[in-house]
A protein has these predicted regions:
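Twin-arginine (Tat) signal peptide motif
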Residues: 1-14, 19-23
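Exported/periplasmic ABC-transporter solute-binding proteins
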Residues: 24-62, 66-74, 83-86, 90-98, ...
Length: 263
């Protein structure tokens, strides 16, 4: 079986391919949380632990923070929103869609991921990426769409900092969200990409390639904020509050998130 095919099967097994959601039956009985895709592995663990401890379930739907923002403005039936960029939360609050201005729950990081067998090497300062652009080794490189995905916007900023943005644009493959971008970066369909540290930390992703963290002063911070929406049931506040408990934060830290001192 071709290596790229095996990697694709591995991604199907993780449930991280774009569009993966829970069953309609779950939507009818459990409150729905619209969560940024970088949270895929960490938040599933947090929600499972919350369920074990309280007996309460939540439905998690993962996608692009910007797309969720637009959907919520248009009346999408979400009860809680966990964005990878706090500005989307502030805009929803200004539009009267939320109960308040939310709470900062994590700080994210980005890095370069390359699949096993790639001619590209993962290094923090993107030196081999620059060399590959010059010597012709680089054909395709993945980032999330910077127009609506916060991790894509930060990838663009990092590439601009490295002086590579203009040269790399013709080579870019844009993911709809950071999960799809990670699939592109590890499946062999590209030679690598910029993905979330929180995804690279997952064992099922880490085994597909190598990863190097990009300096956090190369881009604006990924200040990730959550908020309850106006129609959130009272029971969902327990999950909202659980996100910032030590039990949940221990899981988040294990996936590479930093915990904010000021919320």
């Amino acid at each position: 079986m071709p290596q790229s095919r095996r990697r694709l099967i591995a991604w199907v097994a993780t449930g991280l391919l774009a569009g993966a959601v829970l069953s309609p039956a779950a939507a009818q009985t459990n409150p729905t949380v619209a969560a940024a895709s970088d949270l895929k592995f960490a938040l599933e663990e947090v929600a499972a632990k919350f369920e074990r401890e309280t007996g309460n379930k939540v439905r998690l739907v993962f996608g692009s923070s910007g797309n969720f923002y637009s959907q919520i403005l248009q009346g999408a039936p979400f009860q809680m929103y966990m964005s990878a960029d706090e500005e989307f939360v502030f805009k929803l609050a200004d539009a009267g869609k939320t109960v308040d201005r939310g709470r900062l729950y994590a700080l994210g990081r980005i890095g370069i991921m390359v699949p096993i067998g790639s001619q590209l090497k993962a290094d923090s300062e993107l030196k081999d990426l620059a060399a590959a652009l010059k010597d012709g080794r680089l054909q395709k490189f993945a980032i999330a769409n910077p127009e609506h995905a916060p991790y894509g916007a930060r990838a663009k900023e990092a590439l601009q900092h490295a002086g590579l943005w203009d040269a790399i644009q013709p080579k870019l493959v844009l993911g709809e969200n950071i999960s799809q971008t990670a699939q592109f970066a590890t499946s062999g369909s590209t030679q690598g990409g910029v993905i979330a540290l929180s995804l690279a930390k997952a064992e099922s992703v880490a085994k597909l390639g190598s990863f190097a963290l990009i300096p956090n002063d190369w881009h604006e911070p990924l200040r990730q904020r959550m908020v309850l929406l106006k129609d959130a049931p009272p029971s969902l506040r327990a999950f909202y509050n659980y996100i910032t408990t030590p039990a949940a934060q221990d899981i988040m830290v294990r996936y590479g998130f930093a915990m904010p001192a000021v919320q």
